[in-house]
């Protein structure tokens, strides 16, 4: 908005009005109050004065170049799965040219705004980087806490095990000591008993006996001492073995813990589990020299003979530290994970240039012995790593396996166990992929990708335009032939109903009418049952519903459906009881039926106005409009006008000359010619806008229906239309929606293939009627497809091969030839090439303009595909009077026709005592010796039955014929 006085200019400059008045007076512009008008010349004088007062000179044009550099890091995984850090540097260069013309003030303002936008973008990126860094820090903190918790639990478990082991060893030592003491005591007691016995037997032995006894006592003491020493040695040996086992277990646990830490630590920093003691620095070796056949011996090869000797305690040193020392390069700075790959990149000569790590042409005697594995011979058991896998809406099998850090074959095996055969490149839907992730023991999270549609939601919340009153959108709904369009025509003073094929509405008509009390927008919906989706769209976009009910017909099925649509949308209903000019009209009955459906008139204490009208004479039309506008006032309908437009697609079609054309209802904002619009998967610039009368218009405000041209494709009816400032952003969102829809659709189809195959196997033989449907508008095509699919039965099924909007082309005929389909054109025609191709290939093309006719003819075609029904008709009764046995012929019955007529081609049932004993065919029918075609009632004949000779006198033959009767749906 231009600033026309001092106060507005001060507000624009964000400074007090008094200060601005002082500056104006100093510049020679005489302004006394804040309401004085300002001209462009006054502003120019003020600008010159300010420049001079601040020391600005009128020199040549100058320019300033600003260069901004922003450096960041990103982590990218390569094909092997290793993460690499990549430095990203973003450089921005902007040049500002200083001009002296007053007319360039606006351009400078725009440059400042652009710079502010760049600053805001930079701040936003910095904020995102900070958030990402905080998230990474939080994840690292959680990882550290989890690792500390695991180590704490491991230490507690180890302490408990050590305490139990010490207690067990102490108990064993005590038991061994007790056993040794008991053995010594027993030996001593035995010796004493023997000595006592000897003394008792011979109290006066000689000195020789005493010497022998002393020797025996010494031997016993020696034996007791040896037993005690043996027990002590056994206890010490057991204690040493337990200590050795404990040391080995601790070493294995330390090794496993170091491996876990190395695997869980981020790749940019290699964590060393145990820091080995630094050896003394050796003297700098001389420069290694070698020839082509005998390369220089690396440092690792010098210590090879010593490495072959067994170590004193191989498990005492943790594996990662030892492996790191073994694989370390002379200038090493990288961990052992990448050393092998670096060594393999060297030129392979005939000598072992890798120091024995990788076998070259000379690997040792007969390929043995020289190679020594980097990994430790002890493989400690590690607990499985549970990963959080973010699963997008669609993901291939290979990508899913990569996210879980497993081979794709493992995923394929799991899918096979679940009963689904997949390939490595097959796309899975989100639900199936999450089941697979959970099956493999990981946590599955539904991922939210970088959805460009999120920007649309952010843009919606930021709209703060002024809300102004808008016209109401009124939808006319009701049963077919109840007079909706005729009522609307009387209001519009036009004749539309006569122009619709068959006199019924088959499109949504959108019109706006100017009444003395304001503008009203009307939506006329079809009443035929096939147009349920159209009526639902009409109720979605409306503010008030006019429910038209014929006074002579009452509440019908589509009337009930319209009531349910209005109630589902929470839309107030105004009931118009039409055709009151007819003699059989009964408005009271209509009211009672509507009360039963939950629509209570105001006179009964409800909230729905009931207005009796006549679309033929015009009676009650003014009262109807009065009630509609009264409801609109109660609703206080408002919408922003000075804002980007938003609306809904009411109808869409493909015009041969104009391309995709969409009828949309603007719900808020103002739509102008040249705006960039996005409608579902379609986008484009509005090249032309027409009102409902076909006249060009430049803009359309809230609640105004318009027809727009310039979209990239035909949008689906009911899609939301939104105006975007940038065509690039519109294209990005449209392509994102297309890819998302296509991927999800393919994944769902793939998941349903096996189930559909099993269904078809169980159903057996089912007849299919393939159809290709081309219609003039999206709504008609949708309604026709739904109506035809409802005709499917268990025996005959309608198969819609393809349905689209537009004329019938050669590609449609080619598709019909390949699928053996019938082409149905609804208000469309085939071009010359398509007609010629259809005649050459024998393709049937049917044209319709009334939906009744299309449904009826398809129903008749399906009836013709049904298997005919077989019916039996009894034509006569025959009584057996005499039986003859004829050689080489069999049994022949002499019969009398008692009722009806017997034909040679008829079937027969043999009745004995009124019980059927055989059903078959006549083999011969003779009268005297002549073969005859038929025998009438009251005549005798001879008959023989095929494959049946057990005929007795008194039997009866029931003669019948089988006829086929065509079935109907």
Curated annotation (Swiss-Prot):
Region (G3): 524-527
Annotated region (G4), positions in chain: 578-581
Start and end residues of each stretch annotated as Disordered: 49-85, 100-128, 143-380
tr-type G domain boundaries: 469-638
Record flagged with keyword Ribonucleoprotein: no
Gly residues: compositionally biased ranges: 353-366
Residue ranges, annotated region (G1): 478-485
UniProt entry keywords in alphabetical sequence: Cytoplasm, GTP-binding, Initiation factor, Nucleotide-binding, Protein biosynthesis
SUPFAM superfamilies per the UniProt record, alphabetical: Initiation factor IF2/eIF5b, domain 3, P-loop containing nucleoside triphosphate hydrolases, Putative DNA-binding domain, Translation proteins
Superkingdom per UniProt: Bacteria
Principal place of residence: cytoplasm
Keyword Cytoplasm tagged: yes
Bias (Basic and acidic residues): 49-63, 143-181, 209-260
Compartment(s) of residence: Cytoplasm
Region (G5): 614-616
UniProt record similarity statement: Belongs to the TRAFAC class translation factor GTPase superfamily. Classic translation factor GTPase family. IF-2 subfamily.
The protein, known as: Translation initiation factor IF-2
Organism: Burkholderia multivorans (strain ATCC 17616 / 249)
């Amino acid at each position: 908005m231009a600033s026309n006085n001092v106060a507005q200019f001060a507000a624009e400059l964000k400074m007090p009005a008094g200060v601005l008045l002082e500056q104006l007076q100093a510049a020679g512009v005489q302004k006394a109050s804040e309401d004085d008008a300002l001209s462009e010349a006054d502003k120019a004088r003020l600008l010159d004065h300010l420049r001079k007062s601040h020391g600005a000179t009128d020199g040549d044009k100058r320019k300033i170049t600003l260069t901004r550099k922003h450096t960041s890091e990103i982590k990218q995984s390569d094909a092997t799965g290793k993460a690499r850090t990549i430095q990203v540097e973003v450089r921005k260069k902007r040049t500002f040219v200083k001009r002296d013309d007053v007319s360039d003030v606006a351009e400078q303002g725009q440059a400042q705004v652009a710079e502010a936008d760049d600053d805001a973008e930079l701040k936003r990126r910095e904020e995102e980087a900070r958030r990402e860094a905080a998230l990474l820090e939080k994840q690292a903190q959680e990882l550290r806490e989890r690792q500390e918790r695991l180590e704490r639990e491991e230490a507690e478990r180890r302490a408990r095990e050590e305490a139990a082991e010490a207690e067990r060893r102490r108990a064993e030592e005590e038991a061994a000591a007790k056993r040794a003491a008991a053995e010594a005591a027993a030996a001593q007691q035995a010796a004493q008993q023997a000595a006592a016995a000897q003394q008792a037997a011979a109290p006066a032995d000689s000195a020789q006996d005493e010497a022998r006894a002393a020797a025996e006592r010494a031997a016993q003491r020696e034996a007791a001492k040896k037993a005690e020493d043996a027990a002590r040695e056994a206890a010490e040996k057991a204690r040493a073995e337990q200590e050795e086992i404990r040391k080995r277990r601790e070493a294995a646990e330390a090794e496993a813990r170091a491996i876990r830490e190395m695997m869980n630590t981020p790749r940019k920093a290699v964590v060393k589990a145990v820091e080995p003691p630094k050896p003394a620095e050796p003297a700098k070796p001389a420069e290694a020299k070698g020839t082509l056949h005998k390369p220089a011996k690396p440092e690792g090869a010098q210590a090879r003979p010593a490495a072959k000797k067994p170590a004193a305690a191989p498990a005492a040193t943790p594996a990662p530290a030892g492996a790191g020392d073994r694989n370390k390069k002379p200038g090493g700075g990288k961990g052992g994970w990448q050393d092998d790959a670096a060594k393999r990149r060297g030129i392979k000569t005939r000598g072992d240039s890798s120091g024995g790590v990788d076998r070259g042409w000379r690997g040792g005697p007969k390929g043995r012995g020289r190679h020594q594995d980097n990994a430790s011979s002890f493989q400690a058991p590690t607990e499985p790593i549970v990963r959080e896998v973010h699963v997008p809406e669609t993901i291939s099998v290979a990508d899913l396996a990569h996210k879980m850090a497993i081979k794709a074959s493992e995923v394929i095996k799991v899918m096979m166990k679940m009963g689904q055969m997949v390939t490595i490149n097959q796309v899975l839907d989100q639900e199936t992929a999450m089941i697979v992730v959970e099956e493999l023991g990981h946590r599955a999270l539904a991922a939210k990708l970088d959805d460009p549609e999120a920007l649309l939601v952010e843009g919606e919340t930021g709209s703060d335009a002024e809300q102004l009153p808008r016209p109401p959108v009124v939808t006319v709904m009701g049963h077919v032939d109840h007079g909706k369009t005729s009522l609307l025509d009387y209001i519009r003073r036009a004749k539309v109903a006569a122009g619709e094929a068959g006199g019924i509405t088959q499109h949504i008509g959108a019109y706006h009418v100017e009444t003395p009390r304001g503008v009203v927008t009307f939506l006329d919906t079809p009443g035929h049952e096939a147009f349920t989706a159209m009526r639902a769209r009409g109720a979605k976009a409306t503010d008030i519903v006019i429910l038209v009910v014929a006074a002579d017909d009452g509440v019908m099925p589509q009337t009930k459906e319209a009531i349910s649509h209005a109630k589902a949308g929470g839309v107030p209903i105004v009931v118009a009881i039409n055709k009151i000019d007819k003699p059989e009209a009964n408005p009271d009955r209509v009211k009672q039926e509507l009360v039963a459906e939950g629509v209570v008139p105001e006179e009964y204490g409800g909230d729905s106005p009931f207005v009796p009208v006549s679309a033929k004479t015009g009676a009650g039309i003014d009262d109807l409009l009065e009630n509609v506008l009264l409801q609109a006032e109660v609703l206080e309908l408002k919408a922003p006008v000075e804002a980007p437009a938003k609306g809904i697609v009411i109808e869409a079609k493909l015009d041969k000359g104009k391309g995709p054309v969409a009828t949309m209802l603007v719900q808020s904002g103002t739509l102008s010619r040249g705006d960039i619009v996005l409608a579902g998967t379609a986008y484009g610039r509005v090249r032309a806008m027409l009102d409902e009368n076909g006249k060009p218009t430049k803009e359309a405000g809230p609640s105004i229906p318009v027809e727009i041209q310039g979209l990239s494709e035909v949008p689906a009816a009911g899609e939301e239309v939104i105006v975007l400032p940038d065509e690039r952003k519109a294209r990005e969102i449209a392509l994102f929606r297309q890819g998302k829809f296509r991927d999800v659709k393919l994944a769902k189809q793939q998941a349903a293939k096996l189930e559909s195959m099993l269904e078809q196997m169980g159903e057996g033989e089912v007849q299919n009627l393939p159809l290709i449907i081309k219609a003039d508008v999206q709504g008609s095509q949708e309604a026709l497809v739904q109506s035809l699919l409802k005709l499917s039965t268990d025996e005959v099924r309608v198969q819609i091969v393809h349905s689209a909007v537009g004329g019938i082309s050669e590609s449609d005929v080619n598709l019909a030839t390949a699928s053996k389909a019938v082409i149905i054109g609804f208000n469309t025609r085939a071009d010359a090439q398509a007609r010629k191709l259809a005649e050459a290939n024998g393709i049937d093309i049917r044209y319709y303009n009334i939906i009744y006719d299309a449904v009826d003819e398809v129903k008749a075609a399906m009836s013709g595909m049904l298997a005919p029904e077989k019916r039996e008709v009894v034509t006569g009764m025959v009584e057996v009077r005499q039986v003859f046995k004829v050689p080489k012929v069999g049994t022949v019955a002499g019969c009398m026709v008692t009722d009806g007529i017997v034909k040679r081609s008829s079937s027969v049932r043999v009745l004995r005592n009124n019980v059927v004993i055989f059903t078959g065919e006549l083999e011969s029918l003779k009268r005297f010796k002549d073969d005859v075609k038929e025998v009438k009632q009251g005549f005798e004949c001879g008959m023989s039955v095929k494959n049946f000779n057990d005929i007795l006198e008194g039997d009866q033959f029931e003669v019948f014929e089988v006829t086929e009767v065509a079935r109907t749906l």
